């Protein structure tokens, strides 16, 4: 089952001047839209919104949005941030139902200590987020993968991921998610090793 967060919102008036005033009052302007849903301009408390994001593992989450006392199930689609302060400037929500099919992006979280890393290998995670397709009711907040069995030179591929029931991805199964690379030998370390190899011949 998908995890749902909760947030309160109020309807707001339109206008760019009004947006600046809202932000100065500690509010974040936003909009709710979706098939069969009349677009609604809203405002949410900036601190409450930031607290909700902090409790999630990504910005692609389900939210039970309380709009003036009416609960609407929404998907957080986009968060616009100030490029300098990183403050939230605007949020977009998509109204959904449990059976709405969505395209979303979720983080890939690696768990466990790789056997190869314990031997001096270097873990290189090449995919940190995964594009998935599923119904809203099946949306995971993250995809986790156990890498404790990865040895030197071994890799974790898309086909190795245990996607939750009802969740698929369009990425090919042989795409590498993470690999344990052998430690690189520096030039200074390689020279003595080469000399020893020659001396043994």
Swiss-Prot record:
UniProt key word Transferase: no
Gene3D superfamilies: Ribosomal protein L25, beta domain, Ribosomal Protein L25, Chain P
GO-annotated cellular components: cytosolic large ribosomal subunit
Keywords: Ribonucleoprotein, Ribosomal protein, RNA-binding, rRNA-binding
Pfam family, one: Ribosomal_TL5_C
Family annotation (InterPro entries): Rbsml_bL25/Gln-tRNA_synth_N, Ribosomal_bL25/Gln-tRNA_synth, Ribosomal_bL25_b-dom, Ribosomal_bL25_C, Ribosomal_bL25_long, Ribosomal_L25_dom, Ribosomal_uL5_bac-type
SUPFAM superfamilies for this protein: Ribosomal protein L25-like (SSF50715)
Keyword RNA-binding in record: yes
Gene Ontology molecular-function annotations: 5S rRNA binding; structural constituent of ribosome
Superkingdom of origin: Bacteria
GO annotation terms (biological process): translation
Family statement: Belongs to the bacterial ribosomal protein bL25 family. CTC subfamily.
Protein's job: This is one of the proteins that binds to the 5S RNA in the ribosome where it forms part of the central protuberance.
Quaternary structure and interacting proteins, as annotated: Part of the 50S ribosomal subunit; part of the 5S rRNA/L5/L18/L25 subcomplex. Contacts the 5S rRNA. Binds to the 5S rRNA independently of L5 and L18.
NCBIfam families: bL25_bact_ctc
Stored HAMAP family: Ribosomal_bL25_CTC
Name recorded for this polypeptide: Large ribosomal subunit protein bL25
Species name: Akkermansia muciniphila (strain ATCC BAA-835 / DSM 22959 / JCM 33894 / BCRC 81048 / CCUG 64013 / CIP 107961 / Muc)
């Amino acid at each position: 089952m998908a995890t749902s967060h909760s947030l309160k919102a109020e309807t707001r008036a339109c206008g760019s001047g009004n947006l600046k005033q809202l932000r100065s009052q500690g509010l974040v302007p936003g909009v709710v839209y979706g098939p069969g849903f009349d677009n609604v301009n809203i405002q949410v408390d900036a601190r409450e919104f930031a607290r909700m994001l902090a409790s999630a593992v990504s910005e692609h989450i389900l939210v039970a949005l309380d709009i003036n006392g009416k609960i609407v199930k929404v998907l957080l689609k986009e968060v616009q941030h100030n490029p300098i302060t990183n403050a939230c400037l605007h949020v977009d929500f998509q109204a959904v139902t449990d059976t709405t099919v969505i395209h979303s992006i979720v983080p890939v979280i690696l768990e466990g200590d790789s056997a190869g890393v314990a031997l001096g290998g270097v873990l290189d995670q090449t995919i940190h987020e995964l594009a998935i397709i599923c119904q809203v009711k099946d949306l995971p907040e993250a995809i986790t993968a156990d890498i404790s069995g990865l040895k030197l030179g071994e890799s974790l591929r898309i086909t190795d991921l245990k996607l939750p029931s009802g969740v698929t991805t369009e990425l090919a199964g042989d795409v590498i998610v993470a690999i344990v690379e052998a430690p690189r030998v520096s030039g200074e370390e390689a020279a003595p090793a080469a000399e020893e190899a020659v001396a043994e011949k």
